[in-house]
A protein has these predicted regions:
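Intrinsically disordered, low-complexity linker/loop segments enriched in Gly/Pro
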Residues: 111, 133-134
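Short, charge-rich binding segments
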Residues: 114-120, 140-142
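Helix-start/capping segments and mature chain N-termini
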Residues: 1-108, 137-343
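Extended, Lys/Arg-enriched charged tracts that mediate electrostatic binding to polyanionic substrates
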Residues: 117-128, 132
Length: 343
């Protein structure tokens, strides 16, 4: 008999809560096997597994939402399937077929349906796929065996304060990724490389660190673990860079901006251009949009105040509400981004 859940849905943090099941698929002898269901939170692993030594690990993040109509929707999972394929291929791992990825997502959501937060709680079911190199070896080369796992956990809003502006800080001491390195892939090493800068930013009272381009330290690159966008003159501007992870949320916001008659530009954004922005935000799966109050540059003793009244800008708010409305079934999904999971 299932144990009754004792979860305060309205006050969930963005953290890990154990659920009932995860799903797994093994790659060996040159092919993917059958999908397996597991109730264990542990992965048996050899101490010489390539993921532990040589960083053969890629992951994704997506969400399932219980909508206004009671239906469960997963947002743009085909895009996550394709992105983890690119990440895997970028570090010489086999790509899981899109169809198998989507089957695994549907399966794990159904198996853990009781953990999907209720509509109106502000919470969602976070879905974490990951692929890791499993074969034991000493020597830098791709593994021969891999494990693909998807687990889920209910999460609250990434930022407890909700949709409000927060400060960011430019760091020049660190680069998140090299211009032609692994920055465009969602691999663990990129996040390990950002931990020191992130911890220093948080300790100084900032929401996240802001990286400049690694080559010239002149252009805005990525803010923490999220993409950056600025708005001015009815134009949505986001960096074009070879070291930034292509955000599915940012891609969606660009489409919604065009739908609203807002011009979209993907180009380099010089730091000096921050003085002209009317609105700015960080965007990603976790927070959707985190509006930026100001961006400090302590090394040059400068502060770029984006939000003069301390509130999110009108277009950022409109884009946020539109995207959230689509995810929750409150607004028409004209681009067919959602997959409805039959429970």
């Amino acid at each position: 008999m299932e144990k009754e859940l004792n979860i305060d849905w309205a006050n969930l943090s963005f953290g890990y809560i154990p659920t009932d099941y995860n799903v797994r698929c093994t790659y060996k002898n040159g092919e993917w096997g059958e999908i397996e269901v597991s109730s264990s939170e542990l992965i048996p692993m050899h101490m010489a597994a390539s993921c532990l030594h040589y960083g053969q690990e890629a992951f994704e993040g997506l969400k399932a939402f219980r909508g206004k109509d009671g239906q469960v929707r997963v947002f743009r999972m085909d895009e996550n399937a394709k992105r983890i394929q690119r990440s895997a291929e970028g570090i010489m791992m086999p790509a899981l077929p899109v169809e198998k990825f989507m089957e695994m997502v549907k399966m794990v959501v159904r198996l853990n349906a009781r953990f999907i937060p209720p509509y109106g709680s502000g919470a969602s079911l976070y879905i974490r796929p990951l692929e890791i190199g499993m074969s034991a070896q000493v020597g830098v080369k791709p593994a021969t065996e891999y494990l693909f796992v998807i687990f889920v956990t209910p999460v609250g809003p990434y930022f407890k304060g909700g949709f409000k502006t927060t400060p960011y800080v430019i760091t020049r001491k660190y680069d998140r990724a090299a211009p032609l390195g692994t920055g465009t892939f969602k691999v663990g090493g990129n996040y390990a490389a950002s931990l020191r800068a992130s911890c220093e930013a948080h300790a100084a009272g900032y929401s996240a660190e802001f990286y400049l381009d690694a080559r010239e330290k002149k252009y805005m690159d990525e803010c923490g673990a999220a993409n950056f966008f600025g708005i001015k003159d009815n134009t949505y501007i986001t960096p074009l860079s070879t070291s930034i992870l292509p955000s599915i949320t940012n891609k969606s916001l660009m489409q919604l901006a065009e739908d609203m008659g807002i011009k979209v530009e993907r180009r380099q954004i010089p730091e000096d251009e921050l003085t002209t922005l009317e609105e700015a935000g960080a965007c990603g799966t976790a927070a959707v949009i985190s509006p930026i109050e100001r961006i400090d540059d302590p090394e040059n003793n400068r502060s770029y105040v984006i939000s003069k009244d301390g509130k999110p800008g009108p277009l950022s708010t409109k884009l946020y509400n539109r995207l959230r409305g689509i995810q929750l079934g409150e607004e028409e999904d004209v681009h067919n981004w959602n997959t409805i999971i039959e429970l």
